[in-house]
Amino acid sequence: MITVSPILYAATPSAWHALAEAVGLVPAFPPDATWSEFVADGGLAVHGVAPDDPLSGTTDLHFLVDDLAATETSLVAAGFTAEHTPLDDVGDMLTVVIGSGARVTLTQPSSPPPAPTGPLAVLPIWYQPDLAEPRRLLEALGLRARLSADAGVWMDFVADGGGLVGLHRDEHVSFELSFEYSADLDALAERLTTAGYAAAVVDEAYNRTLRVATPDRSDLFVNGRQDDLYGYTRHDGAPA
């Protein structure tokens, strides 16, 4: 089993904790300024850093797996190399770096993550020019393709332990935190606005998206579930 659990580096972690809960994530334990974890369909970790830290405002693509050794075996069989790093209170961490320089990490938690629940799913987006190698890596990890754009610019994947990952063709390599919401997006926007956040639902070419201002003065995207499949193909990982 594998769970999508990106790591967000935040210079204002308490503000991010509040936003995470307002969007619909639930703290796994009382948040603190250094490290906090939240759960929904998938997970999110918030790592507090100094304002001048180059990592501030960035996101790492991280996964939780139930068998790290078996995961490494699958990666090696698919042609990837995993580097081991021992971490205090965590154990071994696997790091995979692909040809574009994009870096993915994996750890094995001491107890299984909660089962996916609720309408909010974690959906980190992986941007890079060529999507073939990221797709091969995600499939080696056991994620299943859900939707792909016929134009080849987008593909997303579902993890059996919770969460989604989107691949988006772009000239730059980066990861971005986002979410998918399968319930009433307008009602979520109203709740966020009532809580004091600048939030609005906009009509994109592919779907409706909620944009909410973050503590980093950027926008967090919460996508509505995509039901209009014109120009898209549904794959085996999509729910019936």
Language-model segments: which ranges?
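Conserved active-site tyrosine of GNAT-family acetyltransferases
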Residues: A15-A22, L75, G101, P134-E139, ...
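Conserved acetyl-CoA-binding loop of GNAT-fold acetyltransferases
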Residues: E21-A28, G79-T81, E139-R146, Y197
